Amino acid sequence: MQEKDASSQGFLPHFQHFATQAIHVGQEPEQWTSRAVVPLISLSTTFKQAAPGQHSGFEYSRSGNPTRNCLEKAVAALDGAKYCLAFASGLAATVTITHLLKAGDQIICMDDVYGGTNRYFRQVASEFGLKISFVDCSKIKLLEAAITPETKLVWIETPTNPVLKMIDIEACAHIVHKRGDIILVVDNTFMSPYFQRPLALGADICMCSATKYMNGHSDVVMGLVSVNCERLHNRLRFLQNSLGAVPSPLDCYLCNRGLKTLHVRMEKHFKNGMAVAQFLESNPGVEKVIYPGLPSHPQHELAKRQCTGCTGMITFYIKGTLQHAEIFLKNLKLFTLAESLGGFESLVELPAIMTHASVPKNDRDVLGISDTLIRLSVGLEDEKDLLEDLDQALKAAHPPSGSHD
């Protein structure tokens, strides 16, 4: 169920009990003999057995860990899922999911996707006999046309990284599930479960890089995978243990702590993100702004129908050339030039040279990932300070006098 929120601006109402679940699910003090209110960091690699093969739920920390267990239970609740599994990184989660397949199987992947995902599918998974097809899944007819008898997995992001296309998850699920043997995976990194729940819209797997909004403090690298299907969960749990790409107990503790403020942080990201997007849209030095929260976004109505709001991820084209983009980036004072996103601090990057440099140039050109495309991860700073920083950097790139021409 969901509850209404006055700030939703036409988006879906927020999911009911979200904050309460983030704070309490999996955190019960009764699970510890000390009755600790904050879950413990269980660093032990092994656990005593009462007799050979008789244990209390934990044998070896790769197979299962009490701290990781707390995190997985909490995330499952937030994703509206029965099960969650934590991994050492978002790409570790991607690799593990891919191991559900065998040589000869086809993966259909959204063409505009995280550079690391593109690189893994194109340069690694393909070397092991998997067939990879990159398709614009925002166009449902193209997705349907790409499905073959060998198709076993469809991988989408929404919004996409970095050009922020919205994909209709429900429509994709309808097409994909006409066959009973295709898995639909949605990378929910850019939205988090606070703003979007892919499983409720028909996805089989919801994954994310918890490095980003879920942890929210730029000090943990982690991936999360949530599912409702018991059979799928059992297969992934086996692979999690067999491949061994699990996070450390300390990282699980930190991410679990980050979840407690997720609802508060996401509201602020939305507020600041909207303010920055509106400012950029009115700035003469900006060619185009891409933000699903703006009415100008071509899929704004889909965003309102599918999400409870938007995050702080904004993409825009600065007028001019790479030189103008570089001057803008050099003059920013609050926005840090760095890869990654979703932390409390504001970040800025140039995808063509940074996060998406591994994507072939021809593909970047088709997708619109040009030298003047800039990606912002708007943080939690004071709105006025962020706008002033962007304003002065844009003026440096495009002086009002026009002396740079």
From Swiss-Prot:
* Reaction(s) the record says it catalyses: L,L-cystathionine + H2O = 2-oxobutanoate + L-cysteine + NH4(+); L-cysteine + H2O = hydrogen sulfide + pyruvate + NH4(+) + H(+); L-homocysteine + H2O = 2-oxobutanoate + hydrogen sulfide + NH4(+) + H(+); L-homoserine = 2-oxobutanoate + NH4(+)
Top-level taxon: Eukaryota
Does the keyword Amino-acid biosynthesis feature in the UniProt annotation? yes
Q: Where is the signal peptide?
A: none
Q: Which SUPFAM superfamilies match?
A: PLP-dependent transferases
- Indicate the family of this protein: Belongs to the trans-sulfuration enzymes family.
Which GO MF term does the entry hold, naming one? L-cystine L-cysteine-lyase (deaminating)
Tell me the organism's taxonomic lineage.
Eukaryota, Metazoa, Chordata, Craniata, Vertebrata
Kindly state the subunit structure of this protein.
Homotetramer. Interacts with CALM in a calcium-dependent manner.
Names of the cofactor(s)? pyridoxal 5'-phosphate
Which BP terms from GO are recorded? Answer: cysteine biosynthetic process; cysteine biosynthetic process via cystathionine; hydrogen sulfide biosynthetic process; lipid metabolic process; negative regulation of apoptotic process; positive regulation of canonical NF-kappaB signal transduction; positive regulation of NF-kappaB transcription factor activity; protein sulfhydration
Would you tell me the protein name for this molecule? Cystathionine gamma-lyase
Which E.C. number(s) belong to this protein? 4.4.1.1, 4.4.1.2
Spell out the Pfam families in the cross-references: Cys_Met_Meta_PP
Concerning PROSITE patterns, the annotation shows: CYS_MET_METAB_PP
Q: Which residues carry this modification: N6-(pyridoxal phosphate)lysine?
A: 212
Identify the metabolic or biological route this protein is part of. Amino-acid biosynthesis; L-cysteine biosynthesis; L-cysteine from L-homocysteine and L-serine: step 2/2
Underlying gene: CTH
Gene Ontology cellular-component annotations: cytoplasm
